[in-house]
């Protein structure tokens, strides 16, 4: 995971979000905060990384969306090769964890209080089905 230079994420926020997913059984290597030694932040396809950016004017973000994640799945292996997360400046609780969920391959699950609920107002911290051991 690389938090790019202008991403509206604090070091505490990324550490907390990573810990959240680690507690569900996921591993993250080489987490970088506003340091990009590989140049992953400058490419559209950051192979092997999840990169987090501030949303920009080129991003076609719906007016009600709080963030947007794109990920690339290799059709042969079924594995995610890279993901980009674009965040609005006003990051709300659960949004970073939700977007990391997309980067891990989870889609929306519209259950009340669930982390992956499409509507932030209806979501929460429920992690039903998100444990690495349940995949």
Give each language-model segment a name.
Residues 106-130:
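Post-HEXXH active-site segment of zinc metalloproteases
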Residues 134-135:
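C-terminal cap/linker of serine protease catalytic domains
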Residues 11-103, 107-110:
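Metzincin-family zinc-dependent endopeptidase catalytic domain
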Residues 1-15:
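Fold-level signature of zinc-dependent metallopeptidase catalytic domains
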């Amino acid at each position: 995971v690389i938090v790019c230079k202008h991403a509206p994420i604090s070091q505490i926020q990324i550490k907390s979000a990573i810990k959240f997913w680690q507690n569900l059984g996921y591993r993250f290597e080489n987490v970088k905060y506003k340091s990009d030694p590989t140049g992953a932040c400058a490419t559209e396809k950051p192979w092997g990384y999840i990169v987090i950016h501030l949303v920009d004017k080129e991003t076609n973000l719906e007016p009600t969306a709080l963030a947007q994640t794109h990920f690339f799945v290799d059709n042969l292996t079924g594995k995610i090769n890279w993901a980009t997360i674009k965040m609005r400046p006003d990051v709300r609780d659960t949004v970073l964890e939700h977007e990391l969920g997309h980067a891990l391959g989870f889609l929306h699950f519209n259950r009340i209080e669930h982390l992956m609920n499409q509507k932030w107002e209806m979501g929460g911290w429920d992690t039903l089905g998100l444990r690495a051991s349940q995949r």
